[in-house]
Amino acid sequence: VLDEDKTLLETSAQELFHPGSAQKLFVAAAAFNTLGPQFVFRTEVLFDGAIESGVIKGDLVIKGSGDPSFRLEDLENLVLQIKKKNVKEILGNLIIECSEFDEIRMGPGWIWDLQRHGGNIPVEAFVLNQGLVDVWIKPSDISMNAPHVEIDPLVPGICVSNKAIMANIDPYEKSLKVRKKQQRGKDVILVEGALSLKSRPLKFSIPVQYPAHFAATEFSLLLKKHGIKHEGKILFDHNSCCKEVLASHQSAPLFDLVKKMLKFDNDMYANCILKKIGRIKFGKPGTWPNGAQVVREFLLDVAAKEVDEAVIVDGSGESCFNKISPETVALWLKNIHKKFVYA
C-alpha cells in the first residue's frame, strides 16, 4: 500500500524477473527527468551551396532526430515547405543524416529473424510511419487461387512469398498468417494459410529492415510528386556539414508521446526515447548502452538502492536480457509516487 508504506504480500521479492512492458514506465520517468515533458523532436531539411533561380546548387540533407511519431504527412509537409521557397531542382545528392543515433538498429537480445507486428522494429534516427509498411490481402475470385497481396507503400528490397490460397471457409476464421523473414539482406513477407472467398480486405503492418532507406525513398517520391527535380543519388551520412535550415518539423511534446507510448504499449516510441535520452545526456550518438545507462541510474536513484543487479538493455522491454527484482520495482513505484513531480 503506497500511502501507508505497508507490504501486504511478498514472495521471491529479490529474484530477478523479465519486466516486459513494465520497463516503459522506467523509460517514461527517466525521459521526463532528462528531457522535460515539453521536449520536442525536431526533424530538419538543410542544404549547402546556394539557391539560384529555384535551383539548389548542392546537396539537400534530411537530419533525423529520432522522432518515433514522424509520419508520411509530416514528410510531405517538409516537401511543401521546400516548394514554398520556390525550389524547383536539386543538383546535388539527397543525403539522409542519422548521426543522432548509432548504427546498431536492433536491440541486444532481440530475436532478429522473426519480427511481429509492432515489435522488434529496427530503430534509426530517421523513421517514417514507425518503420512499418502495410500489407493488404484481398480475396481473388476462384477457390484455391492465391489471394491478391499489395504492399503500401511499395519499398525497394521487399518481396512477397505468397503461399496462401482462397477457400470456401467462414470469413471470420483466422487461418491466414503474415510474417517477415530476412533473407540475404532483403525483407521477405510470407503469406500463408487460407483466406475466405467472402473475406473483406485484411491489413497487416510489417516492419522494414532499413527504416531510413524506406523514409528516403518516400521523400524522393514526394519531391517528384510536387514537381521538384532531383536526379542525384540518395546517400546515408552520419556527419553532414550542411547548416542552413530550409524546412523543419517538430513533434508533439514529450508528454504526449509518452502518454501514447504507455497507452498503446508502443515499442518504437520507447526505444527511440531511450536512445534520445542517451544522446542528450552524453552529448554523442544515442546508443542502446548509453540510453539504458540513464534509465538504470535513474531507476536505482529513485528506488534508493545503492547496489542492485537490475539489467536494462532496451526501452521496450522486449529483450530477454532485461532483468529486475520485484523489490526494486516496488521501491521505485513507492518513491516515484511520493516525490516525482510528473507522477
Say what each PLM segment does.
Residues V27-F32, I273, V329-L333:
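Buried hydrophobic packing segments
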Residues T11-F17, S205, S316-S319:
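A short glycine/serine-rich beta->alpha loop
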Residues L9, L60, C242-K243, V313-G317:
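Surface-exposed aromatic
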Residues S21, A212, N322-S325:
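Short, conserved glycine- and acidic-residue-centered signature motifs
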Residues T34-D308:
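Conserved serine DD-peptidase/penicillin-binding transpeptidase domain
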Residues V294, V307-A343:
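C-terminal soluble interaction/assembly domains
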Residues E10-A30:
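Short active-site loop at a secondary-structure junction
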Residues V1-T11:
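A short, well-structured edge-of-sheet supersecondary motif
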